[in-house]
From Swiss-Prot:
InterPro entries: tRNA_endonuc-like_dom_sf (IPR011856), tRNA_intron_Endo_cat-like_sf (IPR036167), tRNA_intron_Endonuc_cat-like (IPR006677), tRNA_intron_Endonuc_N (IPR006678), tRNA_intron_Endonuc_N_sf (IPR036740), tRNA_splic (IPR006676), tRNA_splic_arch_long (IPR023516). Homodimer. This is tRNA-splicing endonuclease. Keywords: Lyase, tRNA processing. It catalyses: pretRNA = a 3'-half-tRNA molecule with a 5'-OH end + a 5'-half-tRNA molecule with a 2',3'-cyclic phosphate end + an intron with a 2',3'-cyclic phosphate and a 5'-hydroxyl terminus. Its EC number is 4.6.1.16. GO terms for molecular function: lyase activity; nucleic acid binding; tRNA-intron endonuclease activity. One of its GO terms (cellular component) is cytoplasm. Endonuclease that removes tRNA introns. Cleaves pre-tRNA at the 5'- and 3'-splice sites to release the intron. The products are an intron and two tRNA half-molecules bearing 2',3' cyclic phosphate and 5'-OH termini. Recognizes a pseudosymmetric substrate in which 2 bulged loops of 3 bases are separated by a stem of 4 bp. The active site is at Y289, H300, K331. HAMAP family: EndA_long. PANTHER family: TRNA-SPLICING ENDONUCLEASE SUBUNIT SEN2 (PTHR21227:SF0).
Length: 353
């Protein structure tokens, strides 16, 4: 059998005009050029492994091993991209290289018939992932109406696919603020509201805090500052001195270094109509409810939320654990990216391709 003759040039493999009919028009491999067909390194490796072509470098024929080693020298993450490309092809997708790594066409479609629907970015489980770059990649995909998929290759070359999208969660809770300012005391690492009427209203209609007894309400630090900022409670120290907003923030930040970041996300979620409670049992900052109609019949929370700074770098094993836990308890995993007074959300979930 005569194989197509190709040449390795830089980070591309070049084939003659006959390859256009044999490879592009039948399988949509490569990109037609005036003098033939240009293949990416992963496309060429895939085709070579299936006995479709010979690859030469400076007149020397390269076997699969030699070409794979050359390709790995010429393109960062080549072996990872090859693993993902091969997997997607074997699932029946048409796949083409892109700036994101790959663009993937819907099953039953191909280039020329419809547009690609998915951008796939490839990483090793050991590589950090910048939140800033991730948000830019997701925005670029969403701006052209594409789904953004992160393909993570673990040390045993198994693949996990994550869909990542921006989110704008909206809740349905009215704010049941009492008409009076309730007195509260900042103890060691929490606040207690003493007014029975205000405590009952905040707990039963807004799911704030936890009742210490039938008349008094325990509040977390973020809950307390939010209610303080709304003029619902007056917070004093244990000697009776009234805190200013800045004094409260300073004391809370001494207790918890990331307090102000957590508060920014808490405030954004409450302002958008959600009930926000601690996510400690799930290993996250918050669990979030879209609506709680009755304390006696609390529904399942919709989201788990971790709050991160905009210069954060994901460690993929940690991200994987958070997403897997959220999926296992039928919740969405949101990462709230704190940007000063603004909060943006990334919704990350595992998907099957």
């Amino acid at each position: 059998m005569n194989l197509l003759k190709t040449q390795l040039k830089g980070d591309r493999v070049l084939a003659g005009k006959e390859a256009v009919a044999e490879l592009y028009k039948t399988g949509y491999f490569g990109r037609p050029k005036d003098d033939g067909l240009e293949l990416s390194l992963v496309e060429a490796a895939y085709l070579q492994s299936r006995g479709k072509l010979d690859i030469e470098l400076e007149g020397k024929l390269l076997g699969f091993r030699a070409f794979f080693e050359q390709a790995s020298l010429r393109q960062q993450n080549f072996e990872l991209k090859y693993i993902v490309y091969k997997d997607l092809k074997e699932r029946g997708y048409y796949v083409q290289p892109s700036a994101a790594d790959f663009r993937v066409y819907p099953r039953g479609s191909h280039p020329g018939k419809s547009a690609a629907k998915i951008f796939v970015h490839v990483l090793s489980e050991r590589q950090p992932l910048s939140v800033k770059l991730l948000q830019e990649s997701v925005a670029s995909a969403e701006n052209v109406h594409k789904q953004f998929i992160l393909a993570v290759v673990d040390e045993e070359s198994d693949l996990t696919f994550y869909e990542i999208k921006s989110a704008s969660p909206k809740g349905e809770m009215p704010e049941p603020f009492p008409a009076v300012k309730a007195d509260a005391t900042f103890l060691e690492d929490r606040v207690i509201a003493w007014d029975a009427e205000a405590s009952g209203a905040l707990y039963s209609r807004g799911f704030y805090g936890k009742m210490l007894d039938p008349e008094r309400l325990q509040l977390s630090l973020v809950e307390s500052l939010y209610l303080f900022s709304r003029g619902v409670i007056v917070v004093r120290d244990r000697k009776g001195k009234i805190f200013s907003f800045d004094e409260f923030v300073e004391k809370a930040s001494e207790i918890e270094g990331s307090f102000l970041r957590k508060y920014s996300a808490y405030k954004a979620l409450r302002d958008s109509g959600h009930v926000v409670k601690t996510g400690f049992k799930f290993g996250t900052h918050f669990r979030v409810y879209r609506k709680v109609e009755s304390i006696e019949k609390i529904p399942h929370s919709e989201y788990l939320v971790n709050v991160i700074p905009e210069d954060y770098e994901f460690r993929l094993p940690v991200m994987s654990g958070a997403v897997r836990l959220a999926n296992s308890v039928r919740k969405r995993m949101l990462f709230a990216v704190e940007k000063g007074e603004e909060v943006e959300y990334l919704d990350i979930g595992r998907v099957k391709m």
